[in-house]
C-alpha cells in the first residue's frame, strides 16, 4: 500500500511517500523558519498561507523522486492535530481533495503519534512495549506504549513544555528563533560549574514535569548578570549550559523512574528536543546502567516531517481506518484518546 503523508501542523511543510512493503521511498520538507525569524516566533496566518503555496509542489516533487504518479497513491495521511488550526486545515483540505479525485481513503492522524512512531523508520526499530519521552516545543510527556493506539499517560508537563523553555531562554540570551538548537550550540562554549540551576519536580514522587519555574530562574540569572554588567558572551554560554543541564537532568531522572516503575527496558525519545546531543548521551548512559536500550529517529526526522505522518497513517489505513468525508482539524488532542489500530473507524480518529 503506497501512502502519501502530509505534515502542516505548524511552520514546516512536509510530504513523504511510504510503501508498506518497501518502506520510505521519498520525502521533502520546506521550513518557514527564515520567514518567522523576523517575528521571533511563528505567525499562524503567515504559516497557513505558506503551506498553501508550498504543499502541492512538494507533493509533485516527492512523486518525481520516487518515480511515481498521483494515480499510484493508494491512501493519504495528513496531520489532523494538535497544531495551528489554519495550518491543519490546509493539509486536511489538500489531502481530502486529492483523495476524492483519486477515489482513495484518507485519514487524519495525530501529530505526536507520528513523532512517537518516527523511530520505526530506522533499521533497528523498538519492539512493544516501551516507554516514550515525547519532548518538543508544545509537549513534554512520558507514555507507556503497548501498541499503536495503546497509550497510557505516565506524566506530562503541568505548564511549559521543555522545548518552549528552550525557546524562551534563547530570547533571554538574545538568540534567534528557533531557540532550542541555538541554546544547545551556545551551551557547548559554556564552563561547567559556573551556575547551578534547579531540577524542577525531581525532589518529589511522580512523573509530571514543570519548566515555568526554571524559566523564571533563568530570567532572574540573566537580569542579575545584566545589573552587574557581567553579561558578556562567555556568561551567556555559562547560563545556556546550566539551563540545558537542568532540563536534561530533569528529563533523565523522570525517564529512569518511568522505566523502573513500568519494568520496561526500552525507551523511545521523540520530538524536536530529542535531537539534543546532551540529552541523547545522558539517556543512553542512564539506560545502559539499567541494562536497557534507547531508540530515536535520525535528526532530520526528530523535527516535524512528512515521513512520520506517512508511516503512522500507513499503519492505520492498512487496518481499514479512515476519515470518510470528514476533514479533521483538532488544535488540542490528547494522544491517549486515540483508538487502537484494530478498532474499526470510518469517520476519523476523533470522537
Swiss-Prot record:
Entry annotated with the keyword Signal: no
Pfam name, any one: TsaD
Needed co-factor(s): Fe(2+)
EC number: 2.3.1.234
MF annotations from Gene Ontology: iron ion binding; N(6)-L-threonylcarbamoyladenine synthase activity
Entry's cofactor comment: Binds 1 Fe(2+) ion per subunit.
Compartment(s) where it occurs, according to its Swiss-Prot or TrEMBL record: Cytoplasm
Keyword Cytoplasm: yes
Substrates-to-products reaction catalysed: L-threonylcarbamoyladenylate + adenosine(37) in tRNA = N(6)-L-threonylcarbamoyladenosine(37) in tRNA + AMP + H(+)
Residues at which substrate binds: 134-138, 167, 180, 276
Gene Ontology terms describing biological process: tRNA threonylcarbamoyladenosine modification
GO cellular component terms attached to this protein's record: cytoplasm
Keywords: Acyltransferase, Cytoplasm, Iron, Metal-binding, Transferase, tRNA processing
InterPro entries: ATPase_NBD, Gcp-like_dom, KAE1/TsaD, TsaD
Residues given in the record as Fe cation binding sites: 111, 115, 304
SUPFAM superfamilies: Actin-like ATPase domain
Protein family membership: Belongs to the KAE1 / TsaD family.
NCBIfam families, A to Z: gcp_kae1 (TIGR00329), T6A_TsaD_YgjD (TIGR03723)
Primary role: Required for the formation of a threonylcarbamoyl group on adenosine at position 37 (t(6)A37) in tRNAs that read codons beginning with adenine. Is involved in the transfer of the threonylcarbamoyl moiety of threonylcarbamoyl-AMP (TC-AMP) to the N6 group of A37, together with TsaE and TsaB. TsaD likely plays a direct catalytic role in this reaction.
Name recorded for this polypeptide: tRNA N6-adenosine threonylcarbamoyltransferase
Organism: Marinobacter nauticus (strain ATCC 700491 / DSM 11845 / VT8) (Marinobacter aquaeolei)
